[in-house]
């Protein structure tokens, strides 16, 4: 299982946002929607061995299980609509216990530290100052952690430094978060860029 933990610093934690202004009034939710699409979708299909954790404002987490998800399409508006439903179901979540809003989509009241404690597998921080991804052997069941359009806060960076097994960059140029996810998938799909 591949897991991606994406921190959404400005993302809404309530369902009170318009679907027609994801980059503005929805706090750059468009970035997170693109991350979900990059993590889950392939041409004409979906990866069923992926989980995505969207940590919103360090207080709410939406977990998407690609093996169980239904009704999701790769466009931002569709993904945002399902995230809106998840945030609406937040009242049913009890602490770290998840509530389901639709098949494969779960919401809980937990922040970054609790998510790091819950994931299993080697934690890989995706960061522009890390070692080259190509220099790291592909890992079994990795947990990739990355931030949205903002840098990790000092507190997040400290938690991640303690929890991570590797800190890597995906290339010499800083990429958007969703593009970094695509490169990470390619690294694993090709056994470290060796098998095509």
Curated annotation (Swiss-Prot):
A UniProt-annotated Pfam family: Methyltrn_RNA_2
One example of a Gene Ontology biological process annotation: tRNA methylation
Annotated positions binding S-adenosyl-L-methionine: 126
Keyword S-adenosyl-L-methionine: yes
Annotated localization: Cytoplasm
Residue spans crossing the bilayer: none
EC top class named in words: transferase
Example of a GO cellular component annotation carried by this entry: cytoplasm
Assigned keywords, A-Z: Cytoplasm, Methyltransferase, S-adenosyl-L-methionine, Transferase, tRNA processing
Catalytic activity field: pseudouridine(54) in tRNA + S-adenosyl-L-methionine = N(1)-methylpseudouridine(54) in tRNA + S-adenosyl-L-homocysteine + H(+)
EC number from the UniProt entry: 2.1.1.257
GO MF annotation: an example: tRNA methyltransferase activity
Family listed: Belongs to the methyltransferase superfamily. TrmY family.
Subunit and partners: Homodimer.
Annotated NCBIfam families: PRK02135.1 (NF002560)
Function: Specifically catalyzes the N1-methylation of pseudouridine at position 54 (Psi54) in tRNAs.
Protein name per its UniProtKB record: tRNA (pseudouridine(54)-N(1))-methyltransferase
Source species: Halobacterium salinarum (strain ATCC 700922 / JCM 11081 / NRC-1) (Halobacterium halobium)
Primary gene name: trmY
């Amino acid at each position: 299982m591949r897991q991606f933990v994406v921190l959404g610093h400005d993302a809404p934690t309530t369902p009170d946002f318009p679907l027609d202004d994801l980059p503005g009034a929805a706090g750059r939710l468009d970035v997170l929607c693109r991350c979900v699409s990059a993590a889950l979708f392939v041409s004409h299909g979906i990866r069923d061995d992926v989980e995505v954790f969207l940590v919103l404002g360090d207080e709410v987490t939406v977990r998407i299980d690609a093996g169980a998800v239904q009704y999701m399409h790769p466009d931002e508006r569709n993904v945002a609509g399902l995230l809106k439903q998840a945030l609406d179901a937040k009242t049913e979540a009890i602490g770290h216990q998840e509530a389901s809003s639709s098949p494969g989509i779960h919401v809980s009241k937990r922040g970054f530290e609790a998510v790091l404690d819950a994931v299993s597998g080697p934690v890989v921080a995706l960061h522009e100052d890390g070692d080259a991804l190509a220099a790291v052997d592909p890992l079994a069941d990795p947990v990739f952690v990355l931030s949205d359009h903002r840098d990790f806060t000092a507190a997040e960076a400290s938690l991640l430094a303690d929890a991570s097994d590797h800190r890597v960059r995906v290339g010499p140029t800083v990429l958007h978060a969703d593009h970094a996810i695509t490169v990470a998938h390619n690294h694993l799909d090709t056994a470290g860029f060796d098998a095509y």
